[in-house]
Amino acid sequence: KTSTRTRCAFEVAARDQGAGATYLEPSASQIGHKESIKDTARVLGRMYDAIEYRGFGQEIVEELAKYAGVPVFNGLTNEFHPTQMLADALTMREHSSKPLNQTAFAYVGDARYNMGNSLLILGAKLGMDVRIGAPESLWPSEGIIAAAHAAAKETGAKITLTENAHEAVKGVGFIHTDVWVSMGEPKEVWQERIDLLKDYRVTPELMAASGNPQVKFMHCLPAFHNRETKVGEWIYETFGLNGVEVTEEVFESPASIVFDQA
C-alpha cells in the first residue's frame, strides 16, 4: 500500500540510527507479480538487515518473515497495524497522569480492520480498560476477540464491546476512531457504511458523553474531517457530510492529539 507517515517514520528512524533505507513503491516492484513472495524474501534478506512491509494481506508479511532470514516489520496490513500501536501507546502514556494499566480508552467506528483489531489486542496486552463501540456486524472477528480475552486473563485488562457509542466512551481518557471505508474498498460501500455508523461519529456531544473534561481524541490519520481533500469534497457533494468519522470541531480542538500521535 502507499504510505506517508509510516514510510517517513521508518526512513527518519533509520537515518537517525545511521542506517540506509530503500523504498520499493507498489507500482515499481515485482513482488507477487513476476516474483513470488517467497523468492523475493530470500533475495531481499541477503541484501538488507531488516525489511518493513506495508500491504494488504497479513499472510504476505508472515511469508516474508518466514523466508527472509532477517527481521520483518509489519508496517500495516488489513488485519493489523502494530507499529501504529507503539505510537498510540506512547501518546496515551504522554497525555495521561495514570499508568497505562489504569487507563481507559474507547475505539468507535468500524472495528473489523487493522485499527480496531490492533487497539483491542493492545489494550488487552497492556492491562487497560478497552472498549469497542460499533454495530455488532462491524466488531472484530471472533478469533480476535478470543485472543483479547485470553490476553486480558493474564494482564487484568477489562474488555467491553457494545453497540452503544455513549456507553463505550463513558469515563474514558481517550477516544479513538478511524476512517469508515478502508483503502482498496469501492466507493459503493460509502452509503451502507454511513447508514451503519452515523451514530458513531466523534462529535463534541460524544466527547462530552465521556464525562471527562480532559478526554483526548485520537486518530491514526488520514482523517476525513472537512472538505479540504478530493475525497472529503466528494463525500460532501454525494452525502452532505462535512467531516465523516470526526467533525472538524473535534479534530481541530485542544482535545485532539492526532499530530502528536502521528
From Swiss-Prot:
It holds the Pfam family OTCace_N. Its main location: cytoplasm. Pathway: Amino-acid biosynthesis; L-arginine biosynthesis; L-arginine from L-ornithine and carbamoyl phosphate: step 1/3. Keywords: Amino-acid biosynthesis, Arginine biosynthesis, Cytoplasm, Transferase. The record marks E94 as: Important for structural integrity. GO terms for molecular function: amino acid binding; ornithine carbamoyltransferase activity. L-ornithine binds at N114, D178, S182, M183. Its EC number is 2.1.3.3. InterPro entries: Asp/Orn_carbamoyltranf_P-bd, Asp/Orn_carbamoylTrfase, Asp/Orn_carbamoylTrfase_sf, Asp_carbamoyltransf_Asp/Orn-bd, Orn/put_carbamltrans. One of its GO terms (cellular component) is cytoplasm. GO terms for biological process: arginine biosynthetic process via ornithine; citrulline biosynthetic process; L-arginine biosynthetic process. It comes from the Bacteria. It catalyses: carbamoyl phosphate + L-ornithine = L-citrulline + phosphate + H(+). It is found in: Cytoplasm. SUPFAM superfamilies: Aspartate/ornithine carbamoyltransferase. Carbamoyl phosphate binds at residues 3-7, 30, 54, 81-84, 219-222, 247. Reversibly catalyzes the transfer of the carbamoyl group from carbamoyl phosphate (CP) to the N(epsilon) atom of ornithine (ORN) to produce L-citrulline. Belongs to the aspartate/ornithine carbamoyltransferase superfamily. OTCase family. NCBIfam families: orni_carb_tr (TIGR00658). This is Ornithine carbamoyltransferase. It comes from Neisseria polysaccharea. The gene is argF.
